[in-house]
Every structure is written in structure tokens, then in C-alpha cells.
């Protein structure tokens, strides 16, 4: 650890890694894999003050997990249409607006009706749990609002992706994700985050190296007979059974539970995560939220 006697909020930092691995060519600036606010496609880690983001809003629901009705949403798809009735199309903040609706056009002989959208629509369906497709920083160009992605190629697991924020260049995404979760809670809805811990967007050469393969080349990924394992079909597999990888997964999930107040997690390709790690995840997160909702494919 290091102590710096000045206010570093909003400043950027990186680790300078050097070693014998040929890809470093001596040394390389690397983004902190634990960074909580990563900016831009190439990635820059911003220093934040967690205490500056205000209070959380507790879940206002007594519905038992056994009675869960889960509604899956894509952050952009649910609100990008002009008919969604929001001023925050495609953004986190779209789920913070109440009483949004689409006004039907009047047709001769038929009265024009208002059709509820977003939170109002979700509640009308009788849903009590909202599952949000991946928003952890993924492989995309945050500056391009027209770029589309599902989020299943993660890069930096503690940072929300900026493409759904009002300003991708700063920490707006942190404040806005917290507001979104608080809004769901205020409306009696559990917030579930779809997470990807079976693989990453990282490669093994050149610009494809983000953090893991820079700090400890090859350690974070599985290999079989000298080849990269690819049970995910996405290029690699995280070696969840390795102590430091398991520690990383648990600590990042705990952060999303404590800081963002998510009520549970849906695991993409859970079958690629070892059983001991999954048991530890349930144990650790249950200590934070006894009714944590954990499930996956």
C-alpha cells in the first residue's frame, strides 16, 4: 500500500509492471484489476471516494425468494425507444423515473390510450425482481452511444460500464447505478445483476492484455495439454479454483453487494465455476445479505 498526503479524488492512476514476459518489452502501464471507476476503451483507473456517493435505499419488499418473479432487462433495449417515455433513453437513469408511459396516437372511433413503460410497466406485470444484463465494464467503446453490446465480455469487474451513463468521461456511472438500484428498491423490486466470471475479454498478446495477464501471465486462466481452455466459447476460462482468482471473484461480488446494494447475482455459465468457489460466494455474500439471491446457468 501507499499513502499520498493530498486529495486524489478524480485523479487517474496505473501500475507499472515489468518482467521477463516478452509482451511487456521491459515494462507496461496496467490498469488496476480492482479499479472501481475505469474510463474509456483503453482503460484509465480513476480514484474515487466511496463515502461521497450518498446513502443507499433499502429494499421495500417482504416477498420471499421462493415467490420471486424475475424479469430480465437489457439496460439499453428497455429504454432506448422514443416511445419509452423517458428523457434518459438507453441509460441507467431511465429506471429512476416514475409514471413513464407511451401515448398512443388517436385513431378515428378509438380513444387514444396511455401505455405504461419502464418501472411502471414492470410493476404492472406483477414482477418483484429485475435481472439486469451485464453492466460490469465490458469490451466496447464507451464514447460511441450507438455501439451495441450484451456485456458478456468483461474487462474490469469492479467498474460499471460507462456507455449507459450520462457522462462516460467521469464517475457519473457510479452515482447513476446506485440511483438505479435505490429506485428499484423504492418500488419494491429486487435488483439482480447478471455477472460473467467464467471468462474475460482479455487476450494473451499485445493490446489484448488488460490486467490479469500483465500481473501474472497465464495464472488467471485454465490450460489443458498446453492449450488455452475454452469451454466458454469466448476465448478463455477463468481459473476460479486458483486461490487468488477465487479471492478476486468473491471480493468483487461483495463490493457490488455492499456498495451498490444489489440483492443477488445471476451467473453466466455457472457450470465453468468450481463448486468450492460457488459455495464460498454464497457463504460470504450471505453474511452481508442473509437473503442474497444466487442462481445461474
Predicted regions and their residues:
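Active-site flanking residues adjacent to catalytic metal/cofactor-binding acidic residues
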Residues: 71, 193, 296
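Substrate-binding/active-site clefts of carbohydrate-active enzymes
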Residues: 76-260, 278-289, 293
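The feature marks proteins involved in alpha-glucan
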Residues: 2-108
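Acidic-and-aromatic substrate-binding clefts and catalytic sites of carbohydrate-active enzymes
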Residues: 270-276
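Conserved alpha/beta catalytic core and glycan-binding cleft of carbohydrate-active enzymes
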Residues: 35-41, 46-48, 261, 282-297
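Substrate-binding/catalytic cleft of secreted carbohydrate-active enzymes
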Residues: 207, 269, 296-297
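Short catalytic-loop micro-motif centered on adjacent basic/acidic residues
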Residues: 192, 264-270
Amino acid at each position: 500500500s501507499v499513502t499520498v498526503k493530498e486529495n486524489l479524488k478524480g485523479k487517474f492512476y496505473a501500475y507499472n509492471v515489468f518482467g521477463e514476459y516478452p509482451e511487456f518489452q521491459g515494462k507496461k502501464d496496467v490498469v488496476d484489476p480492482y479499479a472501481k471507476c475505469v474510463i474509456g476503451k483503453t482503460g484509465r483507473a480513476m480514484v474515487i471516494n466511496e463515502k461521497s456517493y450518498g446513502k443507499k435505499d433499502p429494499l421495500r419488499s417482504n416477498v420471499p425468494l421462493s415467490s420471486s418473479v424475475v424479469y430480465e432487462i437489457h439496460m439499453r433495449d428497455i429504454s432506448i425507444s422514443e416511445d419509452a417515455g423517458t428523457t434518459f433513453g438507453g441509460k441507467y437513469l431511465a429506471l429512476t423515473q416514475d409514471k413513464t408511459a407511451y401515448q398512443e396516437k388517436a385513431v378515428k372511433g378509438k380513444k387514444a390510450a396511455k401505455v405504461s413503460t419502464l418501472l411502471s410497466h414492470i410493476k404492472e406485470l406483477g414482477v418483484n425482481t429485475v435481472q439486469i444484463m451485464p453492466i460490469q465494464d465490458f469490451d466496447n467503446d464507451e464514447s460511441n452511444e450507438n455501439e451495441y453490446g450484451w456485456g458478456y465480455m468483461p474487462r474490469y469487474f469492479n467498474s460499471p460500464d460507462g456507455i449507459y451513463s450520462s457522462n462516460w468521461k467521469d464517475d457519473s456511472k457510479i452515482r447513476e447505478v446506485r440511483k438505479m438500484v435505490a429506485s428499484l428498491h423504492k418500488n419494491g423490486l429486487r435488483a439482480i445483476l447478471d455477472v460473467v466470471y467464467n471468462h474475460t475479454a482479455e487476450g494473451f498478446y499485445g493490446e489484448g492484455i488488460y490486467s490479469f495477464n500483465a500481473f501474472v501471465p497465464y495464472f488467471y486462466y485454465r490450460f489443458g495439454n498446453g492449450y488455452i481452455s475454452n469451454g466458454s466459447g469466448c476465448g478463455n476460462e477463468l481459473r476460479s479454483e486458483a486461490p487468488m482468482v477465487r479471492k478476486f471473484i468473491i471480493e468483487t461480488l461483495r463490493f457490488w453487494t455492499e456498495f451498490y446494494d444489489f440483492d443477488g447475482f445471476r451467473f453466466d455459465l455457472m457450470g465453468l465455476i468450481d463448486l468450492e468457489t460457488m459455495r464460498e460466494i454464497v457463504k460470504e455474500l450471505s453474511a452481508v445479505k442473509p437473503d442474497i439471491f444466487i442462481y445461474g446457468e
